[in-house]
Design a protein with these regions (language model features):
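RNA-binding accessory domains that recognize and position tRNA/RNA substrates
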Residues: 1-128, 142-150, 167-205, 217, ...
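ATP/NTP-dependent adenylation/nucleotidyl-transfer catalytic domains that generate, transfer
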Residues: 1-30, 37, 287, 308-460
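Hydrophobic/small residue at the entry helix of a nucleotide-binding pocket
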Residues: 160
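Short helix-capping/linker segments at secondary-structure and domain boundaries
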Residues: 73-85, 235-243, 349-360, 406-411
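Long, compositionally biased low-complexity repeat segments characteristic
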Residues: 127-132, 460
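Glycine-biased, low-complexity coil/linker segments
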Residues: 133-137
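Class I SAM-dependent methyltransferase "Motif I" SAM/SAH-binding loop
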Residues: 155-156
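ATP-dependent adenylate-handling ligase core
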Residues: 181-315, 319, 331
């Protein structure tokens, strides 16, 4: 591979994409200028698949959407001003969705690298596309595919997806626990559920890692957007009518950066993405394919309260991000105890479960370790901004800490005592109440009949 100079790249190309029904393998091909092709593969287990008529056309539409969204991993290496699609045409609605994903989903990447990406990524639009060109037949929107009533539920190994899986089980929804990639931790968690599983393969183009070694731009991408597109493709291929994630309402709020404004590390876990993506899927891919987050009405603390109701997964789950880097070491234990995710999950669970149970899960008491003060200050938004991690809002951390400060078994721990002495006196008592943060919100895409079955359980 010739030397890569990101400043000399002028164009990013979506070269082509294809899906082989006999093997279940999707190939997503990209390139910079006239450089070597970069091919990512996604493998849906269960081949061969019988795909014809409307379903085959829907697979093609889902494949193109995945091709466009997954390209973010490669585009970011050089962020050139020109973009082309070599092998198919898209309309304005598709371009608008994907451009929104790139701009917002690369927000943290742009901030950390000092880049301004506003209006930079623009897709070529072909208007108008006829219903036949879209693969809709003669309809005004995507057809109903008569998909089987069955949910593909994303599992990430943490508490959130396990709450969703158990809620769907209790509601009588047929579900398959689904994950992407080779994490053994996630596999163990998935197997612990006792439900059918689907492990989708994803292999990034090896050239991408070489570009990174040669000085490409690198950083955070909207991975939930990519995983959502992968699972929509899998659902259409498998003939299932629901793709379920476990993103709570706290994900919609980012970090407030002085002089910059809001930067949301988890934008593609937020409501704006879920709404836009879910509506697009139903209008353009399959009318009866529902994409939604089961936990959208809940705060992080409300999810923690639900998780604490059972200890069935205590020895299996982990939200520690050090377990999930593409490259790099994994900790020997499931919780490193020093990253923002460990800090937040410990704090969020503390009000809702016995102290000894929580310490047993983590292997130690994180709130009785003075060296963790800086990490907790960031969660509390005390002299720092919320970390660029998938953690709850500052007000949730403050309310949880205030709750612990009032409890005999916690109030003598060094960081709880520090909060009570140093931080709590600067805050109003009203904003430290935990109960208002447990109230269910009305903004979600959960199918109405399912929500009626879930609502009472989530409120308690």
């Amino acid at each position: 591979m010739t030397a890569f100079d990101k400043d000399q790249v002028s164009r990013f190309r979506f070269v082509r994409c294809d899906f082989a029904a006999d093997t279940g393998v999707a190939q997503l091909v990209y390139a910079f200028d006239d450089g070597p092709e970069m091919t990512e593969t996604v493998t849906v287990p269960g081949a061969p698949f019988q795909l014809d008529g409307d379903r085959a056309a829907a697979v093609q539409r889902a494949l193109q959407l995945l091709h466009l969204i997954a390209g973010v991993s490669y585009y970011k290496a050089a962020v050139p001003a020109q973009v082309s699609i070599d092998s198919y045409a898209i309309d304005a609605a598709t371009a608008a969705l994907v451009e929104t994903v790139y701009f917002n989903g690369l927000g943290e990447f742009a901030y950390r690298n000092g880049l301004n990406l506003r209006d930079r990524f623009k897709l070529p639009v072909t208007e108008p596309l006829s219903p036949r060109e879209r693969g809709w037949g003669e309809g005004a929107s995507a057809p109903n595919l008569n998909l089987t009533h069955h949910a593909l539920v994303a599992i990430g190994g943490g508490k959130d997806s396990l709450v969703s899986i158990e809620a769907l089980r209790n509601a009588g929804v047929a579900e398959t626990v689904t994950w992407i990639g080779g994490s053994q931790l996630i596999r163990a968690c998935a197997e612990r559920t006792g439900l059918p599983t689907l492990n989708i393969g994803r292999t990034l183009a090896p050239e991408l890692f070489e570009l990174n070694r040669q000085g490409a731009w690198n950083g955070h991408i909207p991975v939930t957007a990519v995983n959502s597109a992968i699972m929509v493709l899998a659902a259409v291929v498998q003939g299932m009518d629901q793709v379920v994630f476990s993103n709570e309402r706290s994900a919609s709020y980012g970090s407030q950066i002085a002089g910059t404004g809001e930067v949301n590390h988890q934008w593609s876990k937020g409501w704006a993405f879920e709404k836009a993506f879910g509506e697009y899927v139903q209008q353009y891919i399959a009318a009866d394919l529902n994409y939604y987050s089961l936990l959208r009405p809940l705060s992080e603390l409300a999810v923690a309260r639900q998780f604490a109701k059972t200890d069935f997964y205590d020895a299996h789950f982990s939200s520690c991000n050090r377990n999930f880097h593409i490259l790099g070491e994994r900790p020997v234990n499931r919780w490193c105890g020093v990253c923002p995710k460990c800090h937040f999950v410990f704090l969020a669970l503390a009000p809702f479960m016995p102290k000894m149970r929580l310490v047993r899960i983590f292997g130690r008491n994180l709130l009785d370790d003075s060296e963790q003060a800086g990490g907790y200050d960031a969660l509390l938004e005390f002299q720092d901004h919320k970390p660029f991690e998938c953690v709850g809002e500052g007000k949730e951390s403050r309310a949880a800490m205030a709750t612990l400060a009032s409890r005999p078994e916690w109030k003598e721990d060094v960081l709880v005592k520090r909060f009570a002495n140093l931080i709590q006196p600067t805050l109003s008592a009203d904003e430290l109440q935990i109960e208002p943060l447990l109230v269910i919100d009305g903004e979600h895409r959960i199918p109405a009949a399912l929500w009626e079955r879930l609502r009472a359980n989530f409120a308690a």
